[in-house]
Every structure is written in C-alpha cells, then in structure tokens.
Amino acid sequence: MKYSGIGGQAVIEGIMMQNGENYAVAVRKPDGEIEVKKDTYRSVTKKYPFLGIPFIRGVFKFADSMIVGMRALTWSCSFFEDDEDAKESRFEQWLDKVFGEKLESILMTVVMIFSFIMAIGIFMLLPMFISNICKKVIPSHTVMAILEGFIRIAIFVIYIKMVSRMEDIKRTFMYHGSEHKCINCIEHGLELNVANVRASSKEHKRCGTSFIMIVMVISILFFVVIRTDTIWLRIVSRIVLIPVIAGVSYEFLSFAGKHD
C-alpha cells in the first residue's frame, strides 16, 4: 500500500478530502444534488518552517486540521438551515455589523477554544479527579496513573457510544467510513470509482479517532513517569503536557501510516 498523504473528515451529509494545501468538500443537499467546493489552506508549518520540526509539528498539524474541518463543517451545515434559522436575529445583525466579514472567523475561533476547554475538562481532568478518589486505597503512583488512563479511555469510548446513538451523528459516522474507503482505494493503487471504493476497507491507520486513542495510551506512559505531590501540580501537568503528548502521538501515527 502506497502512502498518499491524503486526509479528510466527515461533514453533514458529505465528506471533506485534503491533500497538501488543497481540499474539497462534497455535500449531498436535501434535493439529492451533490454540491462540491474546492479551496486551499496554507498550513502554519509552511508559513513558519521551524514549527514543522518533528515532535513540535504535531500540535500545529492538529490545529490545521481543526481549522479546515470547521470550515468544511460550517459550509456543509449551510445547506440544512431551516427558514426560521436562516433569518438573523437582532443580536446576529449587530454582530454582523460590528465584525463584518471577520464574524465567521471569530465565531469559529470561539467554538474551537470552547471545544478545546471542554475536551480538556472531560478527557484529561475528569479522569484524574475520579482516580484521585481511590488514592487512599491505592498508594502506588504507577497504579494510579494506569487507573487514570483506563478511566480516560473508558470515558472516551462511552462518549463515542452515546453520541453514535443520535441519528444525525450515526449518519455522519457512516460518511466517516466513506472517507476511509476513498483513501484506501487510492492508496491501494485502484481507480477511484464507486465499485472500487465500495470494495475498500472502512478502517484506516491514520484515522483521527486512532490519533485520540494513541494520545490516551501515550499519556499513561507520561504520567507513570512524571510524579507530582499535590492535586494542583497534577492539574497543571495534565494541561501543560498536552502539546508534548500530542506531538509524540502525531509522530507515532505518522510513522505507522507510512509503514505497513
């Protein structure tokens, strides 16, 4: 299997595919017609080459994927707004008047920051607090770190299971599998057509979900080694080490994606 460098994600009723600075989004509209949008995005690691250094680039690559993903998702959502939702409220009109063309970028930034804070709280700090309850009966730091890691993975799995029960999310997950099929079709040297895509696997090594799982596993190794005396230092370490863990995880996933 040949590495293609192509990535992507599912959006509302469609998929986004990216190769280098170029990306395209295909969305099936309510009338059944498929709308395609092509665009470019220059990575921050291209603008500032020193950010592309191994173990540093992972964080910025993740940020790039978040930005492109949000742009694609926002565009796909625009086809499914109700007439009532399409009408701007007075507050929305005021925001549009104050910020103008920058409004979409500002709102996207706010959503990304809020999502990041929520993710830290749910997947990094909550497992730490839950495992801390067992501190009196489990004196071993190593066992505590492993327990925290397993709780973190359990919370993530439960979260995925819960959201996948929602019809809209379930359908989006199906498109996520379609994205994997397209990439696998290309990387196996097959012509990109419906028959070959259908026959391709819906699993892929460079999947974003795999990245999150790798982050969680590697975080166990980090927190087994790094010892802190107080709960406050534990909180700080969980937050401060996120870029480091993400950087190591990215290199691992990148290596695995390029080798069978």
Model-identified regions with their sequence ranges:
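Cytosolic juxtamembrane amphipathic/interface segments immediately preceding
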Residues: M1, G5, A10-V11, T45-G52, ...
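Divalent-cation
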Residues: M1-E81
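Residue-level signature of catalytic and energy-coupling elements of molecular machines
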Residues: G14, I169, C207
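Juxtamembrane "helix exit" motif at the C-terminal ends of alpha-helical transmembrane segments
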Residues: W75, S115-P139, V215-I239, A246, ...
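Juxtamembrane inter-helical linkers in multi-pass membrane proteins
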Residues: D83-L95, R171-V197
